[in-house]
Amino acid sequence: LRRSRGLGDVYKRQIKKRVPRNASALWNLGARAFTVLFHDGRLAIADDFDNGFNSPAEEWLPHGLETVLGTQAIFPMTAQFEMAGNPKENEVAGALHDRIDAVWPILAKRVRVIPEYGDMFVETFDDVDSAADVTISHIGEALAAFIALEFRSSDAPFDDFIAGDMSALTENQQRGAALFYGKAGCSDCHSGPLLTDQKFHALAIPPFGPGRTRRFDPYTRDVGRMGETDALEDAYRFRTPSLRNVALTAPYGHNGAYPTLEGIIRHHLDPIGSLDRWTPEMANLPHVPWLEAIDFVVWDDRFEMDRLRRRVDIQPRELDDAEVAALVDFMHALTGHSARDLPLGIPDTVPSGLPVDK
C-alpha cells in the first residue's frame, strides 16, 4: 500500500468503511507469556489444525510459522479495510475473495523480487538459499523479530520501584499503586509482569462503528470472544490488554471508545453508568459525513443494547476524584524510560523505494 492510503483529504473521500476495532498495542508481544492475540483471541497457540495455531486461516495457515507473533503479523495483510484493499481494486483483494491462503504467495513475491530484501532474507534465514525461497512465513517471522526487539519494554519507573528504588514513584503514584492492587481491584485482571491475565472479560464498552459481524449476523454488532468460540458465556468479552506503556496507547477499549486514561478507568468503576453517559463525540473519529449516519446505529437497537448491558463481568466500585487521579498517575509510571527512544526507529529509506511515513 502506498502513501495514498494515508489520512489525507483525498483518502477521506475514499473511505467506505471504518475499521471495526482499535489496533492492539505492540509492546512486549515478543514475550513468551503471550500465547493469545487479537481482542477476541482468534489467534492462539494450539494444535486444532495440526499446524501449531488456532487462527482465522484454520488448516490453510502457511507452513513454517514458529511464533504466535510471527503468525499474527501475516493477518493484517488479509484484512480488506486494513491492507488488502477493496474488491476489484487489486489482485490481493481478488485473491482474498477466493481463499485466504491465496493472498500470501502474491505478497511474498512482491517482497522477494526486491533485490535488497532478497539478500537480507538469504543472510538471515538458514533455510533460504536464494530469494526464490522466501515465503510469507519468513516475512512474518522477520516482522515478529523486529516487533519483539523494537517494542520490548521493561524499564518503567514501576520496575525500578519493584527492584527496590523507593524514590522511583511519587507519593501519588504509590497511592495509585496501592489502589491498583487493592481497593480498585485492577490487578484482578491486570496481573503479572505484563499486567494482563490474557483472559476475556465483558465490560459493556460503548459500541459504535461497523462492528465485527459474522456472516449470519442480521445487524451491526461486535460480540467479542463469542465470535470465536460460539459460546454464549463469551458474549461481549474481550481480551485483557497489557498495561505496559498504556499512557502511550490511547484511545482505550477494544474499539477506542475512550480517549483518556481517566475515561476508561471511570468506565471500569461503573460500566453501566458510563455506558449510559457516553457520547459519540468521545469516540474522536475522523470526520467522514457519509459514514456518520451509521457509525452509531447500534444504539437504536434496544435489544442489542440490552444484551450488552446484561453481560458485565466486573462489579462497580467507588473511588473519589483524588483516587482516580492517583490511578491515572500510576498508569504513567508504567511507561518505560526508553519507550520514546526505540532501538531502531523509523528508517530514512526502505528497499522498495516507497516513501517512508515519518
Report the location of each language-model feature:
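Single conserved hydrophobic/aromatic residue that forms the stacking wall/gate
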Residues: 1-7, 11
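The canonical Cys-X-X-Cys-His
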Residues: 4-5, 26, 69, 143, ...
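Periplasmic c-type cytochrome electron-transfer domains
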Residues: 13-125, 129-148, 247, 254-263, ...
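Active-site-proximal structural scaffolding
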Residues: 19, 62, 136, 169, ...
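Detector for the c-type heme attachment site
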Residues: 31, 189-195, 248
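An acidic, gly/pro-interrupted, aromatic-rich
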Residues: 43-71, 202-293
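Post-cleavage N-terminal segment of exported redox proteins
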Residues: 80, 95-174, 178, 191-199, ...
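Extracellular low-complexity, Gly/Ser/Thr-rich intrinsically disordered linkers
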Residues: 245, 251-271, 275-348
